[in-house]
A protein has these predicted regions:
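Catalytic strand-loop segment that frames the active site of acyl-thioester-processing enzymes
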Residues: 31-61
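Residues located in well-ordered beta-strands
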Residues: 35, 97-99, 111-113, 137-139, ...
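HotDog/MaoC-like acyl-thioester-processing domains
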Residues: 2-13, 104-105, 115-161
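Short structured motifs
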Residues: 30-36, 94-100, 121-123
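Hydrophobic beta-strand-centered segment that forms part of the acyl-chain substrate-binding groove
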Residues: 77-116
Length: 161
């Protein structure tokens, strides 16, 4: 585990620091109203609410907002493992596949539970200096617990020399 993970967690679980983090690093997520509901080394849950700001012409959540929340659910786990790491580690989304199952209306929670996989891949990149690619799944569920979308996000990480 990244020795600086808890420092990162303290930033993003503090509501004021998290809003500043979004405004400076991910302004679109700030304006879409994304928030963190749960965060640990293993799991990240991102909350997004269907509203006038996040809707499409069909009165459901715009797909790009769903993609942003899904990517953030896995991305926060990746970012927590690369935060202040020495050597520094680059992180990049290289592919995204999605199944939209149901109209996204109301509050949607995107969950990624791939923290252990992420830690393993980053540690291997540090050990051998090679880029690693891996898929993280982020599942969006509505307030009734029904799946609205399943995103498979392919990340690439590489320890810099």
């Amino acid at each position: 585990m990244n020795p600086h993970f808890n420092s990162f967690k303290n930033i993003i679980t503090n509501p004021i620091k998290f809003k500043f983090f979004l405004l400076t690093k991910l302004p679109a997520a700030f304006f879409a109203g994304l928030s963190i509901k749960e965060f640990s080394t293993d799991k990240s849950v991102i909350r997004v609410k269907h509203s006038w700001w996040t809707q499409n012409p069909f009165r459901s959540m715009y797909f790009a907002v769903e993609a942003m929340a899904a990517e953030m659910a896995s991305g926060m786990l990746v970012f927590g493992q690369v935060y202040k790491r020495n050597p520094s580690i680059s992180m990049l989304v290289v592919k995204m596949e999605v199944d939209f199952v149901k109209k996204a209306i109301g509050i949607i929670l995107f969950t990624c539970e791939e923290g252990q996989k992420i830690q393993t891949q980053i540690n291997q990149s540090i050990e051998d200096g090679e880029a690693k690619t891996f898929i993280c799944t982020s599942t969006g569920k509505n307030e009734l617990g029904e799946t609205v979308a399943v995103f498979n996000i392919t990340w690439s990480v590489k320890a810099k020399k």
